[in-house]
């Protein structure tokens, strides 16, 4: 499953999962103070209202929150027969009724419960948006307009507002009203067709890449819009002008499809699935060892030569037909067989030692257990502990990217449902 269509129980709409700039500080009443001991953060002073659910919208909110933005997550109340809140609270493996994934997706956020089925709830969220820099929403296109909360309406009282709208197919076009899961958008964007073995049914990645790609494109769009807002400050627009950031999940996937379309356009070539190899680039594949698998990227000209010497195939290293990629692609089966013959006689650690010494890109195919035990992840602070309210310590992914002067940080655990409602609403301007 992934995050693109979800019905909040008993709600009459479908949710489609769909250096700080001075202008940010001018446009928010929230404190930009950084917790004690945490260096100044890049997005301190930025106020974000998150109306998103599940993966795409909340991942965008999480990324902004990791770098100091104040992210207020609006969630629906519990209703009879339902748990309430973002459905991701109930996804995958649960501890005391809450997903441990929640500690990743909603860290650094505040949770406010509002019933958007009511006039009072919608009025309150509009007041929150009036004081915000950014609104993240991933409802079905037209939902906010139906509530009287389209961008044209919201920007009248908050002209600097930046609205990130994430949906399956975008806010325009003939497919805009279709429900869209990440799995469908990955297929439409070209990714699914290429995954798997030739002649067999396409497979999907084990995570919702389409959702995450859409979220990251959304964050890029928000940062671009913030820069443009700062540049638009004038006497008539003292806080600058906001805009809509329209992100379609299928387009975010398609944007990462490399040479897929140019090759079809120029040569009529329809790229086909190639299993674990990277078609048209050689050698780059997964190879068996005595006790596992490794991935080797020997596709650079000089790297290929070092790889062949390392595995004792000087004849291939000096073969003039293999000095450039086109020649290697033509003989990729022969090259892969030579590499596989060498790796399958050795343990993973032996392969890693030899090829790392030869400066050949190589790596073990990691499981979660491998990741948790790897010293490089630890040294880069990519595995961080978070403690839940009942005392469970959960390891979560660290902050990406690493900023030298204004780094991101985990400053608070993911909130319980409605944990911050009273505090947030008490700060609203009358």
Predicted regions and their residues:
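Tryptophan (W) side chains
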Residues: 4-14, 24
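N-terminal helix-loop segment corresponding to the beta1-alpha1 unit
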Residues: 22-238, 387, 416, 420-430
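Glycine-rich beta-alpha junction loops
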Residues: 78, 169-170, 249-254, 291-293, ...
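Conserved Rossmann-fold dehydrogenase catalytic segment
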Residues: 171, 199-208, 230-253, 272-279, ...
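Oxidoreductase and adenylate-handling cofactor-binding alpha/beta cores
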Residues: 215-241, 255-266, 308-314
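Aromatic-enriched alpha-helical interface/lid elements that frame and gate functional surfaces
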Residues: 282-358, 362
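An anion-binding loop in the catalytic cleft
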Residues: 289-292, 398-430
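A glycine-rich dinucleotide-binding beta-alpha-beta segment and adjacent secondary-structure elements
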Residues: 357-411
């Amino acid at each position: 499953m992934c995050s693109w269509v979800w019905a909040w129980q008993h709600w009459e709409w479908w949710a489609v999962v769909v250096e700080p700039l001075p202008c940010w500080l001018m446009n928010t009443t929230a404190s930009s103070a950084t917790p004690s001991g945490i260096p100044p953060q890049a997005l301190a002073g930025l106020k974000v209202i998150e109306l998103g659910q599940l993966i795409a919208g909340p991942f965008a909110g999480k990324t902004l929150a990791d770098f100091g933005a104040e992210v207020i997550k609006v969630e629906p109340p519990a209703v009879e027969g339902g748990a309430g809140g973002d459905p991701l609270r109930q996804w995958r493996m649960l501890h005391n009724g809450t997903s441990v994934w929640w500690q990743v997706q909603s860290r650094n956020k505040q949770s406010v419960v509002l019933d958007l089925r009511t006039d009072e709830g919608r009025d309150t969220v509009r007041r929150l948006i009036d004081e915000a820099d950014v609104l993240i929403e991933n409802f079905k296109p037209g939902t906010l307009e139906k509530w009287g909360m389209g961008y044209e309406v919201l920007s009248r009282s908050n002209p600097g507002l930046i609205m990130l709208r994430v949906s399956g197919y975008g806010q325009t076009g003939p497919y805009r009203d279709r429900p869209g899961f990440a799995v469908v958008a990955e297929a439409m964007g070209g990714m699914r067709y290429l995954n798997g073995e030739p002649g067999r049914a396409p497979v999907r990645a084990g995570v919702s890449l389409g959702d995450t790609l859409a979220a990251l494109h959304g964050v890029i769009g928000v940062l671009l819009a913030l820069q443009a807002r700062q540049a638009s400050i004038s006497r008539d627009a003292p806080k600058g002008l906001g805009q809509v950031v329209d992100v379609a999940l299928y387009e975010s996937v398609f944007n990462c499809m490399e040479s897929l379309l140019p090759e079809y356009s120029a040569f009529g070539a329809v790229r086909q699935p190639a299993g674990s190899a990277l078609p048209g680039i050689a050698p780059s594949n997964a190879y068996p060892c005595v006790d596992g698998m490794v991935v080797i990227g020997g596709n650079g000209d000089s790297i290929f030569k070092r790889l062949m010497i390392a595995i004792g195939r000087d004849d291939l290293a000096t073969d003039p037909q293999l000095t450039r990629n086109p020649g290697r692609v033509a003989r990729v089966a022969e090259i892969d067989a030579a590499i596989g013959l060498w790796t399958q006689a050795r343990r993973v650690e032996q392969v890693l030692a030899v090829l790392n010494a030869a400066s050949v890109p190589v790596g073990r195919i990691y499981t979660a257990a491998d990741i948790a035990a790897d010293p490089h992840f630890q040294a880069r602070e990519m595995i961080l502990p978070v403690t839940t309210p009942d005392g469970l310590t959960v390891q979560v992914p660290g902050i990406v990217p690493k900023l030298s002067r204004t780094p991101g940080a985990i400053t608070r655990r993911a909130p319980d449902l409605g944990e911050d409602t009273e505090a947030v609403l008490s700060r609203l301007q009358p």
